[in-house]
Structure formats: C-alpha cells, structure tokens
Amino acid sequence: MDFIEAASLLDGPLYRGDPDSSSNRQMYAANRERQGSDMQYSKEEIRQYVAEEDIKFIRLAFCDLSGRQKNISIHPDELDRALQYGIAFDASAIPGFGDEVRSDLFLQPDTSTLCLLPWRPDHGRVARMFCGIVRPDGTPFEADARQLLRQAVREAEDMGVTFAFGTEMEFYLFQRDELGEPTKQPYDHAGYMDIAPEDKGENVRREICLTLEQMGIRPECSHHEQGPGQNEIDFRYSRPLTAADNAVTFRTVVDSVAVRSGLAADFSPKPISGQPGNGMHINISAKSADGADVMPLIIAGILAHIREMTVFLNTVDASYLRFGGSKAPRYISWSSENRSQLIRIPAAQGEYRRAELRSPDPLCNPYLAFALLIYAGLDGIRRALPLPAAADINFFTASQQVKERFETLPATLPQARALAAGSPFLAELLPPAVLEYYTK
C-alpha cells in the first residue's frame, strides 16, 4: 500500500454512536465506496442517520479568511432546504467577505463531512457538516478558502500529482483564575516528553485524542513539548481537504476539552516570552501518476516562494517572534533530519517519506496554507526548478558569516505583507479580496 492509498483510508465520513446501529453500518459501507472520491451522501442517507442518532441540531460550519471556524445551527426540519438550496447568512458581518451591498451568501453542506460532536449531550445530539460558500446564483464564492483548496487539488490532479498533508500541532494549556478567565499561568512545568506526575496535561491530551477518534480523526502520537504547559499532537497524512478540515476540527476539540477541564488552550505562536512558541509543522507528501520522483521539484518550488507566502503561514505579529529560536526556522534552507532547517526530510522511507515545513504556526488558515503549498510545488514541477544543495549545518550554533549566505524569512508582519502584496505569483492565484485581506 502506498501513501496515497493509505491516506484514502483515513478520509471519509465521521460518525459516532453505536457501531452496530444500522445507520452507522450503512455509513461505513458507503464510506468504503467513497474512499478517494468526492462522492456525497444522499439526502435519504443523511435523513436516516439524523433520525437514528437522535440529532436535534446540525451545525453548518465554515471558516473566515483568517481560518477561524464559524457556524449556523439548524434544526433537522431545515435539512432538506439546506441540502437543496443552502442556508443564507450575512456576509457583511465576516471580515473580508464583502459589504452591505452584496451581503447575501449561502452555506452549501458537504455531506461527506457529517459528524457527531462527542462533547455534546447524548440525547438531542449535535452534528456538524463543513460547507462550501456560494453566491445566490449558485456560483462559488471566490473568497471561500475551502473552495480555493479544492481548486488547487484539481489542478494538481490535472498534472498527475496527488498530494497528502499531515500536521504537528502545538498548544499551551493555561490555568484559569477564580472568575474563570484565562491566565498565563502554565498548567504544569514539565519538559520535553516528560511523563506524569510532572506532565499534568497527559489526561487532557488523552481526552482530546479519544474525542478525535470518536469523530473519525486518528492522531498519530501525542506528548508534552518543551515549554511549561506546552503540548503536541501529531496527525498522519490525509488528502489535502480532509487534512485541512481535521486541523480546524482539532482546534475546536482542544478548546472544548480544555474548557471542560477548567483550563484554557492557547494556539498563539508565542504565548510566553522567553519560552518556545507554538508551531504547526506541515508534512507534505506527493505522488506522480507517471512514477517520477517529484518531491525535489516540489521542495524547490516551496523554497522559491516561501518568502511571499509567509504572511499566509504566519499571520500575526507574534508569529515573527518565534522565528530563529527553540527549533523554529529563520533561514530558507533544507536538509535531512536537521531540525534547524526550514524544510526537513525526516529519516523515513516508503509511504512515510515526506518533507516537513517547520515555519507555519497554528493560527494560519489551513485551507489557504495547503493550497499555496500545492501551487508552489506545482510551479517547481512546471519550471523544473533545481533543488539547492542541502544545508547540513546547525543554524542555532552556526557563525554569522555562515548564516549570511542564506536568505531569511520575513522578520516582521509588515515585511511579510509587503512581500505578498508585490508577488506576481500570488496575484495570479488568489482572488483580490483574499490577497487584500492579508496584505492591508
């Protein structure tokens, strides 16, 4: 089994409840037929599932341009209308989505993403579907990041290239004060891969992983990170849209489990001055239909465009405080295994072979991040860009004379915005509204 076939086994509908119920058996059987495809569930399948699982509310979820999840909840009686016509919302209230002149947009459910929310009540359950965003005439909304990722995937497939992504997500757990407000007091003071009792977050991570598994998302591993109260949960690769949906779901699950535990989760790139920041390392795999090894070309394309793409991977001022310290990269380079590099090729073979991009942080919009990485990789393939020589040096200890030979990532958010604003590559790929949102 190669990695693309393996990734397809991790995609599909997300369900929970009695595994032997007729609805879950039918959903599972249908999933086997849909693996690796964009096939949707029929209205009849959805209706039966909602009725048998006692679902009383259905969240229609989408993301704004920053990657923050939004939703509208509907009653099952409105399900047919949602599936046939979509559900309207006021786009003028979402930054970057438009103004009062053209404010009506519609949420169109992607039925393949139907999923129960395990932390909601067992009676009168709550389900969720991710949605596409369309205009009143049914045409896709140009600033829908999920749709932009779909387009990137289709373009890659037209070139005979199939991508898969996996993320490594870091976050801090902080205590709350007597009023329930978040503090900057870490939940523990454990170190890298410590165990209980020093690692107080062990049970929280366990609950997060179990909740994700109930939703059909399979974490690969979890552990305490370097910072006090800092945690990491990693995911094996999936197809790009599934991986992005899972990244958004992950943040929601972590926040929900943390609140139930009396804690606050923090995904920001630099929660505590002087301590390691939070990263979202992105593992990239690709397979060409003709059997060619396209990974060197993809890496070359990403290296060529990384400076202009950085504002989409690192979206806030604090993102740039993280670069250059605690295993976060600053210099544009690649190497095997070396964790001081921007792109690292881990010591893995076969289906696990991948390139790890280490600069992004968890506040990025995963749909936009994955789409731009695909486009950069495809540009490397089209232009047959040569891969620079591996930089087998430790940038954290190298002399300034050595480091000056390498370009750096943008040092500030304004610098990153300016690079994106002046990029012909991005101007050709992104709708003006999306580019303006990130560069103004």
Predicted segments with their positions:
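Short glycine/proline-enriched loop/turn "hinge" motifs that connect secondary-structure elements
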Residues: 118-125, 163-164, 222-227, 274-275, ...
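Intrinsic-disorder-associated, low-complexity terminal segments enriched in Asp/Asn/His/Tyr and depleted
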Residues: 2, 15-20, 24, 31, ...
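Catalytic-core signal marking the mid-to-C-terminal active-site face
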Residues: 257, 263-264, 287-440
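A generic structural motif
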Residues: 64, 134-140, 197, 237-243, ...
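Positively charged N-terminal leader segments that act as targeting/secretion signals
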Residues: 5-7, 12-13
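Helix-rich catalytic cores of soluble enzyme domains
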Residues: 172-272, 276-289
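Structured core elements
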Residues: 61, 71-73, 130, 172, ...
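ATP/Mg2+-dependent ligation/transfer catalytic cores
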Residues: 36-221, 243, 297, 404-440
